[in-house]
Design a protein with these regions (language model features):
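Acetyl-CoA-dependent GNAT
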Residues: 16-91, 102-104, 108, 145, ...
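Short hydrophobic/aromatic beta-strand or adjacent loop that forms the aromatic wall/cage
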Residues: 56, 155-161
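Conserved GNAT acetyl-CoA-binding A-motif
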Residues: 109-121
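Conserved glycine-rich acetyl-CoA-binding loop
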Residues: 67, 89-103, 112, 123-129, ...
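Conserved catalytic-core motifs of GNAT/GCN5-like acyltransferases
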Residues: 118-122, 129, 133, 138-155
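Conserved N-terminal entry element of GNAT/NAT acetyltransferase domains
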Residues: 1-20, 160, 166
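Residues at secondary-structure transition points
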Residues: 40, 44, 96, 123, ...
Length: 166
């Protein structure tokens, strides 16, 4: 899965995350999701991340010189895959890393027999919808928002389900 590229002339590789990556992953994810001020607390914690990594896989983009700059979660759910928690270090957003990780996640899910992939986008993050549409996703439904995090009082939020055939 290693595939070098460059970012600020530093070679990158995409690989599966390991338990040793969890501290750096926590920092990366919580930094990338800090824009979600409509929710209390951080995006994830070590226990949740450990549980996710037992259930599915996290892909990371890592500078060969060291340091994680992006990640995405994948999970096989029968004939469909799920992708979530796409995080890009704020200093590297807009550099193509999101697309690169989405493609890696899609390749992985396809190799596991998935014919489609689903994602969920919080309704408060409408700026993400055009990004996922450019990646080929279409809106297919809504789900109730549920998380250990608490919404800011007075804020409404639900999950927009988007899907893509692989």
């Amino acid at each position: 899965m290693d595939s070098p590229t460059s970012l600020d002339s530093s070679p990158l590789r995409v690989r599966l995350a390991t338990a040793d990556d969890r501290p750096a992953l926590l920092s990366l994810i919580n930094s990338a999701f800090s824009i979600e001020t409509f929710l209390d607390g951080t995006r994830t914690d070590d226990a949740q991340l450990a549980g996710m990594m037992e259930k599915g896989n996290m892909f990371v983009a890592e500078k060969v010189s060291g340091g994680l700059v992006a990640s995405v979660y994948t999970e096989v759910r029968g004939a469909r895959g799920y992708m979530g928690m796409l995080a890009v270090d704020p200093a590297h957003q807009g550099s193509g890393l999101a697309r690169r990780l989405v493609l890696a996640a899609e390749d992985y899910l396809r190799s596991r027999g998935c014919g489609a992939v689903d994602i969920t986008v919080l309704s408060q993050r409408t700026e993400l919808l055009p990004l996922y549409r450019r990646f080929g996703f279409v809106e297919t439904g809504r789900e109730e928002f549920s998380t250990p995090r608490t919404l800011t009082p007075g804020v409404e939020c639900y999950c927009i389900v988007m899907s893509k055939e692989l």
